[in-house]
Regions:
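Extended alpha-helical targeting/anchoring segments
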Residues: 1-389, 512
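Helix-start/capping segments and mature chain N-termini
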Residues: 248, 285, 364-437, 441-592
Length: 592
């Protein structure tokens, strides 16, 4: 999975503008150790120790948690706004090797880590949750407005967290985000202990190159549009809007003030004002602030002067020239998204926020935060959701509840009312008294596609099934969250029922890594043991089929229940039954 082997610590700092002539991306491998600073009083000592490591030939990157910045603030003057909890540390990761790469070389490396697939493997987010409700957001903005009126500040960045589940690998997620939003400050970092950092933020916090310090604050956002004329109009509006320009000026003034603390007197300048840049889901307004580094100011000194609580990663590639803490090498800091791995499940967090001034409207700022998050939550996962439904001209179609629930969980926009109207119109055009198979597909963008075909009767009332373990099929993984949703990521399932048809059967029954029966490629399965019908529980890795639910919850004569089942249970069963919404329930027999 990584350059050093599965589970190894590494860091990829990824510049979308890197080329063969200017290999500005960096891949750090051969992890040696880390140095962690949890106390601002120890910052200089930790930086000095890391500088000694670099003088000895190691390469360093630095990750600074959001909350660490609060340790560096002067408590007497810092506003006491409540912030999100973090581990409040700054850590140096030290590596033996640093390889410079072009953009294409980075892509080649990422492909290798993602199983050699030209297209990124299936990955995405689910169960996205905001750390604040709308009422809490509004109350926080009201409190900030009160503080602004009291003169505590004239602009405050309010940030909250999104929490989400991640299905698929962090490498695949980074590949998809990288393709969706190329940036100069991308990062994919596997940390000690199994956590990950992913960054596709376009915002530069601060960098030092030679004697130049540079910051590129972002303030001002407008939504992108698929319509070119609307998209251009949004960019033009953002560039000329007085409110956005005023807020951008405030941020620039803050950075000018911060840089002046660590710069040569009179050297602070703003070479670029109000630049409007396109990204995946938004236009962003940026400005550039530069200053001449004050000789003798250490990296720790720059942090104390500038760091106000931004989540950051740092590329200290050139590093200090020696172990003297008063010497500062080149570096580059930017904000980061941080999905973290926990056991077999990936949990992610991402900070989103807005700069609040006196005329900021809470509802508008909340909408802007959600818009900024769309580059992640709206990323294409590599599959569609779909349903295969029984349809007639007379009865229409029945179930959309499962598709609606899956769409909500996986973040697919779904207009159920509009889709029902489309399906009703499709059913009205079908021949009378003729059963049809209707397939409804839903894309990540919310686009739908409906197709129909005549439903061919089965040749036999009792159908045959194969056992996947007898025919070289893959083992299912019970913990795979996508097994709970009907998606087009089902190559093994499709191969299962097609091979079954080729052998005169209807379906293939699959098993998980624990040897538990799960489901068929296109059906759920029920097994009769000692006079009682049983079906595998969802925890075995089972799609909650519509007909399965009917048989469990509504068919009182069947009295079926859930239970972990095995291959032996299938072979020794008194009877077998498979079911789906298209064919209802069918008696089955194993073909070996």
């Amino acid at each position: 999975m990584t350059a050093d082997g599965r589970g190894a610590v590494f860091a990829l700092l990824d510049d979308c503008d890197a080329s063969a002539a200017r290999r500005s991306s960096r891949l750090y491998t051969g992890f040696v150790h880390e140095r962690v600073c949890a106390d601002a009083a120890q910052l200089e000592a930790v930086c000095e120790a890391a500088a000694a490591d670099m003088q000895a030939g190691l390469h360093a990157i630095v990750l600074a948690d959001y909350e660490f910045g609060r340790h560096l603030l002067d408590g007497a003057s810092a506003p006491s706004f409540k912030t999100q909890h973090g581990d409040a540390t700054l850590r140096f990761l030290l590596f033996e090797r640093c390889e410079k790469l072009s953009r294409d070389e980075v892509e080649t490396w990422l492909v290798r880590q993602d199983g050699g697939l030209a297209e990124p493997s299936v990955v995405g987010t689910a169960n996205v949750r905001e750390s604040v409700e709308a009422e809490e957001f509004n109350a926080a903005i009201a409190a900030i407005h009160a503080a602004l009126r009291a003169g505590d500040s004239y602009q405050v960045n309010y940030t909250y967290r999104l929490s989400f589940d991640v299905f698929g690998s962090p490498v695949a997620l980074y590949r998809r985000l990288r393709a969706r939003q190329p940036v100069r400050y991308g990062a994919l970092i596997a940390l000690p202990g199994g956590a990950w950092v992913l960054s596709c933020s376009p915002e530069l916090f601060v960098e030092k190159h030679g004697a130049t310090l540079r910051a590129r604050p972002m303030k001002g956002t407008a939504p992108r549009s698929a319509d070119p004329a609307t998209d251009r109009a949004a960019a033009e509006f953002l560039g000329s809007d007085p409110k956005n320009r005023a807020e951008n000026v405030m941020i620039v003034d803050l950075l000018r003030n911060d840089l002046s603390r660590v710069a040569q007197t009179g050297s602070v300048k703003v070479p670029a004002f109000f630049s409007v840049e396109p990204y995946a889901s938004v236009w962003q307004m940026t400005s550039t602030v530069e200053a001449a580094w004050r000789p003798g100011t250490s990296f720790a000194g720059i942090l104390r002067g500038l760091y106000t609580g931004a989540i950051g990663w740092l590329d200290a590639a050139s590093g200090p020239a020696g172990a003297n803490q008063n010497v500062c090498g080149d570096f580059c800091m930017s904000v980061a998204i941080r999905p973290s791995a926990q056991a077999d499940v990936l949990r992610g967090t991402m900070g989103v926020g807005a700069d609040i001034v006196l005329d900021s409207v809470a509802q508008d700022e909340h909408a802007e935060c959600r818009l900024k998050a769309r580059f992640l939550t709206g990323a294409e996962p590599g599959f569609e959701l779909f349903e295969t439904l029984y349809a007639t001209r007379e009865e229409g179609v029945r179930h959309l509840a499962r598709l609606s629930a899956s769409a909500a969980t996986l973040g697919f926009p779904f207009d159920a009312k509009a889709v029902r109207a489309q399906m009703a119109a499709q059913c009205a055009s079908l021949p009378a008294q003729t059963a049809h198979r209707m397939r409804l597909a839903l894309g990540k963008s919310g686009a739908t596609q409906i197709t129909t075909a005549v439903l061919t009767p089965l040749a036999e009332s009792t159908v045959g099934v194969l056992l996947a373990s007898d025919h070289d099929f893959a083992t299912m993984q019970a913990g795979d969250p996508l097994l709970r949703h009907k998606t087009t990521r089902r190559a093994e399932y499709d191969r299962g029922w097609r091979e079954a048809e080729a052998k005169g059967a209807f379906d293939t029954l699959f098993f998980n890594e624990r040897g538990e029966l799960t489901e068929g490629g296109r059906s759920n399965v029920f097994v009769k043991l000692a006079g009682r019908w049983w079906t595998p529980p969802l925890s075995s890795g089972v799609l909650p089929g519509v007909m399965r639910g009917v048989l469990l919850e509504e068919d009182t004569s069947l009295q079926a229940a859930e239970r972990v089942l095995t291959r032996a249970d299938v072979l020794n069963a008194e009877a077998l039954m498979i079911c789906n919404a298209l064919r209802v329930a069918l008696p089955a027999r194993v073909i070996r």
